[in-house]
Amino acid sequence: MPSVKVRENEPFEFALRRFKRICEKAGILAETRKREFYEKPTQERKRKAAAAVKRQMRRTSRDVTKRKRLY
């Protein structure tokens, strides 16, 4: 778990902001949301496959738009 030591004469809000930033970088909130409810293995595979298709479509659409410009 990330920890933050409050420096001398440092306001609590600044330390809290640093802690939030560290947690965000570590991905703790995303992990918590993901584990909030049980996800069946088949549902997880479906979700990951759909994300891969979406990524691939986005990647190919970017390539197509880059090649279209002939000016």
Curated annotation (Swiss-Prot):
The lineage of its organism: Bacteria, Pseudomonadati, Pseudomonadota, Gammaproteobacteria, Lysobacterales. Belongs to the bacterial ribosomal protein bS21 family. Disulfide bonds: none annotated. Signal peptide: none annotated. GO terms for biological process: translation. NCBIfam families: S21p. This is Small ribosomal subunit protein bS21. Keywords: Ribonucleoprotein, Ribosomal protein. Residues 45-71 have a biased composition (Basic residues). The keyword rRNA-binding does not apply. InterPro entries: Ribosomal_bS21, Ribosomal_bS21_CS, Ribosomal_bS21_sf. HAMAP family: Ribosomal_bS21. It comes from the Bacteria.
